[in-house]
Design a protein with these regions (language model features):
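Single conserved hydrophobic/aromatic residue that forms the stacking wall/gate
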Residues: 1-16, 20
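A SIS-like phosphosugar-recognition module
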Residues: 4, 21-270
C-alpha cells in the first residue's frame, strides 16, 4: 500500500518550493543589474547615470527631496523601501575621513502609488515653488486576460505618461496666471516590461547601486547609521524613566521630563 502525504502537507511543500523558485529568480534579476553596473561603461550605466543626475540636482538646483511614484498597486511598498535605503545610507554630514562635508548630501525621498498621488502632492509638483525630481515606475503589460483589467491598466499607463509629459511641457499658453503650468520639471520613467521576480530584483539592485555611487561621489560612508543607533540608546533610558517609580532623572531636559510626567499621569495605576 502506497502511503501518500496528507493533502495539506503537499500544498505547503509546493508553496514553499514556489517561494524558493521566486527567490532564486529575484536574486538572478539583482545579479543581472550587478553585472550591468560592474561591466557597462559610465555613459550607458543606469545606476551611474541616475546617481550623477541626483547629485547634479542636489548641488546646482538646491534639490532637497525627490519622489518615487509607481503606477502599480503591487509596487505600493517600493517608495517606503527606497526611503530607508536612501536616507539611512546617505543621511550623513561627515566624510569617510571624519571631516565635515562642504556640500549638501542625501535627500528626502518620498512617494506613493501614482493614481492616489495625482490628487494630492502632484499639484505642488506642477505649480509649486519646490524643485522635486520624480521617478515614475510603470509596468508595460499585465498578465490578466480580463478585458476590463487590461482597459484599466491602459488608463493607468496613460495617466503615468501624461503626468511626466505635463511636468516637462507644462501649459504656459494659458492667459490666466493661475492656470499656467511652467513645465521644465525633471522626471525619469522606468518602464518595466512585466512585473515578475526577476525584474523586481533588477529594479531593487538598480537603486541600491545608485545609492552606492552617490556615497562615492559625496565621499561618505553609506554603511553605518549612528544617528539611528543614538535613538535606540536614548529610548532605553526613556523607557527606564517611564517605568520607574523613583524620582525623575536629572540627566533629561525639562521638555522630556514634562512629557514623561504627562504620560505617567495617564498610565493605569498598578
Amino acid at each position: 500500500m502506497i502511503r501518500r502525504p496528507p493533502r495539506s502537507t503537499h500544498c505547503i511543500s509546493s508553496a514553499a518550493s514556489d517561494v524558493y523558485k521566486r527567490q532564486i529568480t529575484f536574486h538572478a534579476g539583482a545579479h543581472s543589474m550587478d553585472r550591468h553596473f560592474q561591466e557597462e561603461s559610465a555613459e550607458k550605466n543606469m545606476p551611474v547615470i541616475m546617481a550623477m543626475i541626483t547629485v547634479w540636482y542636489n548641488a546646482f538646483f538646491n534639490c532637497q527631496s525627490s519622489a518615487v511614484v509607481p503606477y502599480s498597486h503591487r509596487l505600493k511598498e517600493l517608495p517606503f523601501y527606497l526611503q530607508q535605503l536612501s536616507m539611512e545610507s546617505l543621511g550623513k554630514s561627515v566624510t569617510k575621513e571624519n571631516d565635515q562635508v562642504s556640500i549638501n548630501t542625501g535627500e528626502i525621498l518620498w512617494g506613493t502609488v501614482g493614481t492616489n498621488s495625482q490628487h494630492s502632492y502632484f499639484q505642488l509638483l506642477h505649480q509649486g515653488t519646490q524643485f522635486v525630481p520624480v521617478d515614475f515606475v510603470a509596468i508595460a503589460k499585465t498578465r490578466s486576460k480580463s478585458a476590463d483589467h487590461n482597459e484599466m491598466h491602459n488608463h493607468l499607463l496613460a495617466n503615468c505618461l501624461s503626468q511626466s509629459l505635463a511636468l516637462m511641457k507644462g501649459n504656459s499658453e494659458s492667459e490666466e496666471a493661475q492656470k499656467k503650468v511652467t513645465g521644465n520639471k525633471p522626471s525619469n520613467t522606468l518602464l518595466i516590461d512585466e512585473l515578475n521576480p526577476f525584474n523586481l530584483g533588477c529594479l531593487i539592485a538598480l537603486y541600491e547601486h545608485k545609492v552606492f555611487v552617490q556615497s562615492i561621489l559625496w565621499n561618505i560612508n553609506a554603511f553605518d547609521q549612528w544617528g539611528v543607533e543614538l535613538g535606540k540608546i536614548i529610548s532605553k533610558d526613556i523607557y527606564k524613566e517611564l517605568t520607574s517609580t523613583d524620582n525623575e532623572s536629572n540627566e533629561l531636559d525639562s521638555s522630556t521630563k514634562n512629557l514623561i510626567k504627562l504620560i505617567k499621569r495617564n498610565m493605569p495605576h498598578k
